[in-house]
A protein has these predicted regions:
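Detector for C-terminal structural segments
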Residues: 31-62, 75-79, 112-122, 143-266
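A glycine-/small-polar-enriched, mobile loop at the entrance of the PLP active site in fold-type I
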Residues: 1-25
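Short helix-initiation/N-cap motifs at beta->coil->alpha
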Residues: 133-143
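Surface-exposed patches in mature extracellular/periplasmic domains of secreted proteins
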Residues: 90-96, 132-135, 211
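Immediate post-signal peptide segment of exported/extracytoplasmic ligand-binding proteins
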Residues: 72-105
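Short, well-ordered beta-strand elements
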Residues: 100-110, 131-134, 151
């Protein structure tokens, strides 16, 4: 057998979705920011009064826990942010001034995700946050997701190279309270609505790219999601008798690509 080391450059992020109102006050820096282009700035300018100033000025990257010291530093920063929002540890539990405890459940449909969220749960406990996870069957998971009956779930939002009408279902306020919609976060933001419309009705490719970048920036700065995991490759074990094209496509799903293009060596 051999091992295919290189695969698509397609990003494969999975983001847990918060569904717990008190978490809005955590003010955790959970977004990725990059330089804002001239066209993107011009598109966002009419909404400046409704957006944080950092949207226009800062390049932001998520904190990296590089060893125990890095993790400790991140936890200390999180503790400071929580305290500034009125959350303090009392009797070993994080509470606000009204005595409301910060606790939530992560809903899972795949057993393998337990080992992924467990370190997250353990780190939250160091801040006095009581978090746990529950594994349910796929049917119940889908039902609870459709009806927004969850505190937090693990989910991925697949995107194409030409975003369009589907963005309305993902982010628009019209889909926020619609049962079964893809707006699992429940976003209701007039700026997001306006930018979604810019994407959907973009007159040309350049306008589409600018609108998509602007929407992406605003969504990330909204801190609706916690980046969960990422890998730039597909890990594929295969028999040495199989062969594949020397030039890989930029974007592809592993299984269909293998079925359609691989062959048996002669």
């Amino acid at each position: 057998a051999a091992y295919l080391e290189r695969a698509a450059t397609l990003d494969m992020d999975d983001y847990p979705r918060w569904g717990y109102e008190t978490l809005d006050e955590m003010r955790a820096e959970l977004a990725r920011f990059f330089g804002c282009g001239k066209d993107e700035l011009a598109l966002l300018q009419p909404y400046r009064s409704k957006l944080p100033p950092e949207v226009f000025t800062e390049t932001w990257k998520p904190p990296v826990a590089d060893g125990p010291e890095g993790l400790r530093k991140n936890l200390q920063q999180a503790k400071s942010l929580l305290e500034s929002a009125g959350w303090k540890v009392r009797d070993g539990v994080l509470q606000n001034q009204e005595g409301q405890k910060l606790e939530f459940e992560i809903l899972l449909a795949q057993k393998g995700f337990g080992r992924i969220v467990e370190p997250f749960v353990q780190n939250l406990s160091k801040l006095g946050i009581k978090a746990g996870y529950r594994l349910v069957d796929v049917a119940l998971y889908q039902r609870r997701a459709d009806t927004r009956d969850f505190d937090m779930i693990v989910n991925a939002i697949g995107q194409s190279q030409s975003p369009g009408n589907e963005q309305t279902g993902f982010w628009h306020s019209s889909a926020a309270d619609q049962e079964g919609s893809n707006n699992l976060i429940g976003i209701k933001d007039p700026v997001v609505d306006a930018l979604v419309d810019k994407v959907v009705y973009a007159p040309d490719r350049a306008s589409l790219i600018t609108a998509t970048h602007a929407l992406d920036r605003v969504l990330l700065h909204g801190e609706y999601m916690v980046p969960n995991w990422y890998t730039p490759i597909h890990r594929i074990a295969y028999k040495s008798s199989l062969a594949y094209p020397g030039k890989l496509p930029l974007y592809y799903a592993a299984e269909p690509w293998m079925i359609r293009t691989w062959w048996i060596k002669k």
